[in-house]
């Protein structure tokens, strides 16, 4: 079949539209605000060999690791027509336990093997474990929730009821989980239907051929992007504040070797896996690498598995970037992934300084809470959210305020929805002024968010950048560190709020019981600044002098 670049563009957009429509269906059918409002989900399309052909414009931390989930499901199960695999095991293709992934084969008529796979991943607000929200402090993965290896949730199109019952018996909010899981099944079926329709219209041969062309095109574009980076060895390192169990900083180190249009990304020198939950599995580390190098390309280049062909990732086993069972990993997905990105960008800033921004907030500021709602007949509830912060400034532009960045791509939960669904009141939601780092271009400001618990509640905070600030680049100052506080019920008065009463400081990672009336205050970090402030002052003086000279020349 003769290659046609116009047809390539058509098929690129067709595959992408399938992933996007899957996401729209999942969002509309979901029960939980975390999926319906915050859009904490991702969808993708894969070829029959498990290579990603298209990814929705969803969550980078999900998408870059999803090929491993598909590979794990295909290796563990014989997936026939109508089957849907479910998994969340970080040590078998998953990321952390709240992220439940579904994988469905797509069989075209009369085919004996799948032509495609469709997959989606969604963060469930609770999947059991010791703490409501399944993101609490832990030393082992067994404390974090229900661990699901690749299993069939649907077989020949029929729900495996015993498995669903087992899952719902181990979570706090069974009705919500059932609704979200059903929405994920619907998203898979939408993807299957669209791909079968595509094959019916264009033929399996042409659709398959252009799928392979997309992989090759992505690989070639990544090779060209690597060719723009000077050959050499570039190193970077950064630290997590602690692991939640000890106060010891956790080191992430990377060496990037660029040679002959290829890159080796080596994390040798990173800290050993730690006692707490900020361990990342290999899928998370590869996902962060995928994201950073994808950012070097034009946005029109398709996000496929081909992008990783010229890139080799070395993540030593038993370290914080490739933890072994039974390490706890809930924070590795949300916090360590962000620090890996910061470390990679710092290394690349030594190679291509004019293209790399300063560090963004570097944390997702995860907040979980749960309990029983006495206003609604003691109905159980569990909620999860991440809170935005400042992004790093870059060459030629300041950072954005109050924005999710890098490995997350979620929205916020509207205050009206949050207060309607859960027994809480949002007392303050504002930009944290002057928290961005100073520089020729200033880092973005973070957020101040205050939530009052109206019933006794179990609360968890999983955050970072509370001790070590987001770095600036090219002479820019770091952004402000974040801060977590609790205001006891007796101190939360109108007069105290007007005076800005300080709260009791919380650790970056903690779990606690909050009596009714307790206020949780989260102040998120600002982004780092870029460029020295002095250069900005000199530039203003030059502009004034130039203007004065032009006026004098005109008058003369």
Q: What do the predicted segments below correspond to?
A:
Residues 1-109, 114-264, 268-556:
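Glycine/proline-enriched, intrinsically flexible loops and inter-domain linkers
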